[in-house]
């Protein structure tokens, strides 16, 4: 392992995807995270503005697309291959506008998770793992259909249409 070229170079795209994974229509690399003021100052000195700064949402990164005949929803996976989760679309409040591609986060409000699901559903202890477990299920039962209605998709990047600057999104 220590001498493994792929592991050293961290090339996620060289990994053969699992059967349940699909090639994403757009690459979804991990976003930079800044936790300390010093890191923010370093970032600002390295990159010219303008900037769009947002809070880090703790859920499952997703991509929603309506550029084909049917809408599609994917998880980020390794950024190149993710999971198709189209079966969740009908339970989420997603736009039906044609020809849009939006990146966002599937989350549950923390207060809602604590009041309705903490320790009650599959012994869930935190909201991120709770969301991940639901989203990654191949089939969902009637109880889970109701739970999924409590999940929000929070958009943070409009990929299509392409002419929108981040500050206009």
Label the predicted regions.
Residues 1-95:
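Phosphate/adenylate-binding "loop-and-lid" substructures adjacent to NTP/NAD/dNTP-binding pockets
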Residues 27, 49, 58-62, 98-104, ...:
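Structural beta-strand/beta-sheet cores of well-ordered domains, especially the beta-sheet scaffolds
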Residues 6-25, 32, 37-38, 84-87, ...:
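Catalytic nucleotidyltransferase
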Residues 65-67, 114-118, 141-143:
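Short acidic, glycine/serine/threonine-rich loops at helix termini
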Residues 94-117:
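Flexible glycine-rich surface loops and low-complexity tracts that mediate binding to linear polymers
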Residues 42, 113-117, 166:
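Short, conserved acidic/polar surface loops in the N-terminal third of protein domains
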Residues 34, 56, 67, 76, ...:
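Structured loops at beta-to-helix junctions and adjacent beta-edge loops in soluble globular domains
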């Amino acid at each position: 392992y220590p001498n493994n070229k792929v592991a050293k170079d961290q090339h996620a795209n060289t990994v053969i995807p699992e059967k349940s994974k699909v090639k994403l229509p757009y690459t979804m690399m991990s976003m930079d995270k800044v936790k300390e003021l010093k890191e923010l100052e370093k970032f600002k000195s390295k990159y010219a503005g303008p900037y769009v700064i947002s809070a880090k949402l703790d859920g499952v990164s997703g991509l929603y697309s309506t550029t084909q005949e049917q809408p599609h929803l994917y998880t980020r996976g390794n950024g190149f291959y993710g999971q198709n989760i189209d079966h969740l679309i009908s339970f989420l409040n997603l736009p039906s506008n044609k020809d849009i591609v939006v990146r966002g986060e599937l989350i549950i409000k923390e207060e809602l998770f604590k009041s309705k699901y903490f320790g009650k559903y599959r012994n869930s202890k935190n909201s991120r793992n709770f969301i991940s477990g639901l989203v990654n299920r191949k089939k969902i039962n009637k109880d889970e259909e109701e739970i999924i209605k409590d999940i929000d998709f929070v958009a943070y990047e409009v990929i299509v249409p392409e002419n929108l600057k981040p500050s206009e999104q």
